[in-house]
């Protein structure tokens, strides 16, 4: 329970009390709970869909993502912006890492956020409500999976504790948890898009690690956001074209 509460304080803005002193061992134990945090976020995001009989779907979709950003505090989308600014600067590895640490947002960061919002709002409109519940689960499982396949790119920083705590075991547990939940919703509609997403995450992690020499807290945040969009896109394409 300590580890779960610790993860909630780190990765959400949900007002929970953590009455313990910080212990790195609790953090290490807690990384495997990140998909569980994703499920909690998903349940909260699902609540606006209960108003479907009374409110038009576009308003519900906007409410879902507004709630998502309130719950996460925009933490991961900030990482996406920093990652875009750094990588698309096409500078040296050291310069990219410096740019990503800069609190100011650049043109590529703004474009990244805009494209992500457009895609998320559009895809969510066509995504079944139960699959929307799984979106944050997939995102956080992807974070653990990505971290388990790389090293930390900086010499110090908050992201290092997370990445160094994720090993193959944690990656497998996170994926298995996601697939288990997905199987309860839809084998075709959830499991196949999850498989496509995790494959995409593996490729993305390899590419970023090659560019930066590893991953950072920002690129893990970017991975969460990109994987969520990829999951919805895969589900949409499978539903409309193949299945």
Swiss-Prot record:
Report which residue ranges the record marks as coiled coil: none
Note the Pfam families from the entry: CobS
May I ask which residue range the UniProt record assigns to the signal sequence?
none
Q: Where does this one sit in the cell?
A: Cell membrane
Q: Which GO terms describe its molecular function?
A: adenosylcobinamide-GDP ribazoletransferase activity; cobalamin 5'-phosphate synthase activity
Name the needed cofactors: Mg(2+)
Any single GO BP term: cobalamin biosynthetic process
Kindly state which reaction or reactions the protein catalyses.
Answer: alpha-ribazole + adenosylcob(III)inamide-GDP = adenosylcob(III)alamin + GMP + H(+); alpha-ribazole 5'-phosphate + adenosylcob(III)inamide-GDP = adenosylcob(III)alamin 5'-phosphate + GMP + H(+)
Q: How does it sit in the membrane?
A: Multi-pass membrane protein
The record's Gene Ontology cellular component field reads: plasma membrane
| Its job | Joins adenosylcobinamide-GDP and alpha-ribazole to generate adenosylcobalamin (Ado-cobalamin). Also synthesizes adenosylcobalamin 5'-phosphate from adenosylcobinamide-GDP and alpha-ribazole 5'-phosphate.
What is the protein's given name?
Adenosylcobinamide-GDP ribazoletransferase
What organism, scientifically named, is this protein from? Alkaliphilus oremlandii (strain OhILAs)
